Regions:
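Periplasmic-binding protein-like
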Residues: 150-154, 235-278, 300-310
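Bacterial lipoprotein signal-peptidase II cleavage site
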Residues: 35-44
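Extracytoplasmic small-molecule ligand-binding "clamshell" domains
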Residues: 46-131, 140
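N-terminal secretory signal peptides
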Residues: 1-12, 16-34
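Bilobed "Venus flytrap"/periplasmic-binding protein-like clamshell domains
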Residues: 71-73, 85-101, 154-207, 211-212, ...
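A ligand-binding cleft/hinge motif common to bilobed small-molecule-binding domains
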Residues: 114-115, 132-140, 196-197, 221-256
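Extended ligand-binding regions for polar small-molecule ligands
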Residues: 93-101, 160-162, 189, 258-301
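Acidic, polar ligand-binding/catalytic clefts
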Residues: 105-175
């Protein structure tokens, strides 16, 4: 019996460095279509030739503190399997890059994902960077940075499910193809809202456990979830990741959305920090840093140009 995977363990395998090849080119096709605290390091020396970006909005001078779940948080931020005292992940690298431009140190602050917004509003850190999505409810209490990654929702089914025979990751599929099925996703995920739009779909939410094991065990019919998570856990994209032969991604990613950095709207410091972070992200988009990070984590695709990443 395969143990259940919680959100953090689940995320631990999604989108790291390139080089893996899935039979039939599935990984390459998919990526082309998609979209206690551990010391985080991060130097304080600004990038040569670049005017340092302001850091007046920080809670603690010299320290850029961002909330995230690292326990099982791959590919976003998680302990390096070969050195658990060191964090890795694409958002970890983005945090370091922003801090370097600002001449400060980046520090991830551990917090449970389900309590992340409450911690942000209690000013436990400067901002949230954890695959954070903009929603109408969050916009009531949060400010948001410009988008730093564009992704789509991905359908996953059992590889031997005859109902989806002939369906590949290049098929044009959507919500209507899930009607009549029980579909799993993570609680508080964007996919949960999307599935809720169609009353002919039975949605099963997972918190803290996540749906891949239940899918493999025939307890649900499909999963709908962020593309980067599927790339890591199902397709095996990234160092240390392993493809799951019992499952397959079908259909092109749809309902594209973006990841943002969130700030507490009621905190006066956030009014200062948000434009500083936006300035840093703008530099990282134009100088190739973000593209380099996403290439390393097998997350680069043409959709990133739509949000200004070069």
């Amino acid at each position: 019996m395969v143990p259940q995977i919680d959100r953090r363990t689940f995320l631990k395998r999604v989108g790291q460095a390139g080089g893996l090849v899935v039979a039939g080119g599935a990984l390459e096709s998919f990526l082309a279509a998609c979209g206690g605290n551990v010391s985080t390091g991060g130097g304080t020396t600004p990038t040569p030739g670049v005017t340092p970006i302001g850091n007046a909005g920080l809670k603690t001078p010299g320290l850029l503190q961002w909330g995230a779940t690292s326990d099982g948080g791959a590919p976003y931020v998680f302990p390096d399997p070969s050195n658990p005292n060191q964090l890795v992940g694409f958002e970890y690298e983005i945090g370091q890059a922003m801090a370097k431009l600002m001449g400060v140190v980046s520090k991830q602050i551990e917090n449970d994902y389900g309590q992340m917004e409450q911690a942000l509003l209690a000013n436990k850190f400067d901002m949230v960077m954890n695959g954070w999505e903009k929603t109408p409810d969050r916009e009531k209490t949060e400010l948001f940075s410009q988008a730093y990654y564009r992704y789509g929702q991905q359908i996953v089914v059992r590889a031997d499910d005859t109902r989806f025979a002939g369906k590949t990751n290049s098929s044009d599929l959507g919500l209507t193809d899930l009607e009549g099925l029980t579909v799993g996703t993570g609680a508080s995920y964007k996919a949960a809202d999307i599935l809720g739009e169609d009353k002919k779909i039975t949605t099963k939410l997972y918190d803290p456990d996540l749906p891949f094991n239940d899918l493999a065990a025939h307890r649900i019919d499909a999963v709908l979830i962020d593309g980067p998570i599927v790339a890591y856990y199902v397709l095996g994209a990234g160092p240390g990741a392993k493809a799951n032969p019992a499952l397959k991604a079908i259909g092109k990613p749809f309902r594209t959305d973006d990841y943002f950095i969130g700030f507490n709207k009621a905190n006066p410091n956030a009014q200062i920090l948000q434009p500083e972070i936006d300035q840093a992200l703008a530099v990282l988009k134009k100088d190739g840093t973000l593209k380099t990070i996403y290439m390393k984590w097998s997350m680069w695709n043409d959709q990133q140009a739509e949000i200004g990443i070069m």
